[in-house]
Amino acid sequence: MTVRVRFAPSPTGMFHVGGARSALQNWIFAKQRGGVFVLRVEDTDAARNKPEWTEGILSALEWIGIARGSYEGPYFQSSYAAEHRTAASRLHEGGRAYYCDCTREAVQARTGSPHSGYDGFCRDRDLGPGAGRALRFRTPDEGATVVVDLIRGEPTFENRLIEDFVIARSDGSPVFLLANVVDDMTMGITHVIRAEEHLPNTPKQQLLWEALGVKPPVWAHVPVVVNEKRQKLSKRRDKVALEAYRDEGYLADAMRNYLMLLGWAPSGDREIVPWPVIEEEFRLEQVNPSSAFFDEKKLRAFNGEYIRALPVAEFVAACQPWLTGTATIAPPPWQPDEFDADTFAAVAPLAQTRIAVLSEIVANVDFLFLDSPLIDEGAWAKAMKEGAGDLLDAAITAFTAIPSWDAESTKSALEAVGAEHGLKLGKAQAPVRVAVTGRRVGLPLFESLEVLGRERTLTRLRAARVRLP
């Protein structure tokens, strides 16, 4: 038997990080078994679907390593409407479904509760199709439905507690439960790996599989992804769009490494693991069924580690969208003709150790490509206290006099200036750093001065001095 898994997102918004994790888990599971990964776009919500969301899904999958052309599809659920209707008719003709004209208000009036569920009122009324009549599945009165789940064992659901659920609306269109099952049957899906939130629907879907005469797939319900308050990640409340992380400058390798750790751990005590090792070691049976915390701070730290591990040439290439202004986040304040690739290459190894996401590169190097630094007034107020003017005067004199302009020489000169003013180097360099770079923190100061050059450094020190009494 060829293993066939599917990833079935809906094109109704940005691509959710939880969906990305499910896609990767399906992808690895199929790859380990020489199987097939099927992409099915569940596009039946015409009011919310947009072509750009579908393209966003394809682009996001490609970014995390699931390239176009390496999987089967994409198929579109809307293309299978005829199959959905045929399945609904089979269930009705076989006595496994019946028409119902009950409104919610009528059910509530009979049961006395808005939460009691459907009471089976129309089971034996022998209604035919018509306006206001939905098609309901006839759930068995006895027995239990056992779901074989690779992560959760064998959850068992008493059939008498499963209400007769709707499988087709009064206009004949199928609901999600039926369409999903029919599509999986049509595509020969053998394993369904998806989020825990779908588990309550699983006994209903398994009953549909059995009623249609097909062996159900093997199920695997991975833990739901939650925020720091243990709430399910929400598009309205949390930062969940994979594209947002990509655009901010997270690396794909860091992102997919982190996503795979949501509910699973590799061997040993390591967490940053080469992708081939993850592909080899991952086992669905080892996934923890408890909720998985999406820790953005930890992801950020992961990304910083991945950035620092890049060869410098790859780091320089990765920064290009932000340096050239083609990125959508953190546009550079300089004009294209002001950017100098050689200058950036000189400081790239210094910047590489100080950023956690690529978009931070602009704020770290902007002072190198502007005529004047962008002064952070808060940093200015803290650095330019009493005595700062005298210290800048002394630094200008010292920097003018040194015979060679390099990091070691400028450091020695400023150390001497600081000693004359009773200051250690850390205190002495604060006014100089703000005057030259505009910020209190950033790249190593003296290496930055070397790249900036003597004349530009002195020009900025003099400009800062003019602002002081």
Curated annotation (Swiss-Prot):
A motif ('HIGH' region) lies at residues 9-19. Binds 1 zinc ion per subunit. Its main location: cytoplasm. Pfam families: Anticodon_2, tRNA-synt_1c. GO terms for biological process: glutamyl-tRNA aminoacylation. ATP binds at K235. The keyword 4Fe-4S does not apply. It catalyses: tRNA(Glu) + L-glutamate + ATP = L-glutamyl-tRNA(Glu) + AMP + diphosphate. Its cofactor is Zn(2+). It is found in: Cytoplasm. Keywords: Aminoacyl-tRNA synthetase, ATP-binding, Cytoplasm, Ligase, Metal-binding, Nucleotide-binding, Protein biosynthesis, Zinc. It is an enzyme of class 6 (ligase). One of its GO terms (cellular component) is cytosol. PROSITE patterns: AA_TRNA_LIGASE_I (PS00178). Gene3D superfamilies: 1.10.10.350, Glutamate-tRNA synthetase, class I, anticodon-binding domain 1 (1.10.8.70), HUPs (3.40.50.620). Its EC number is 6.1.1.17. InterPro entries: aa-tRNA-synth_I_cd-bd (IPR045462), aa-tRNA-synth_I_codon-bd_sub2 (IPR020751), aa-tRNA-synth_I_CS (IPR001412), aa_tRNA-synth_I_cd-bd_sf (IPR008925), Glu-tRNA-ligase_bac/mito (IPR004527), Glu-tRNA-synth_I_codon-bd_sub1 (IPR020752), Glu/Gln-tRNA-synth (IPR000924), Glu/Gln-tRNA-synth_Ib_cat-dom (IPR020058). GO terms for molecular function: ATP binding; glutamate-tRNA ligase activity; tRNA binding; zinc ion binding. A motif ('KMSKS' region) lies at residues 232-236. Zn(2+) binds at C100, C102, C122, D124. Catalyzes the attachment of glutamate to tRNA(Glu) in a two-step reaction: glutamate is first activated by ATP to form Glu-AMP and then transferred to the acceptor end of tRNA(Glu). Belongs to the class-I aminoacyl-tRNA synthetase family. Glutamate--tRNA ligase type 1 subfamily. Monomer. This is Glutamate--tRNA ligase. The lineage of its organism: Bacteria, Bacillati, Actinomycetota, Actinomycetes, Micromonosporales.
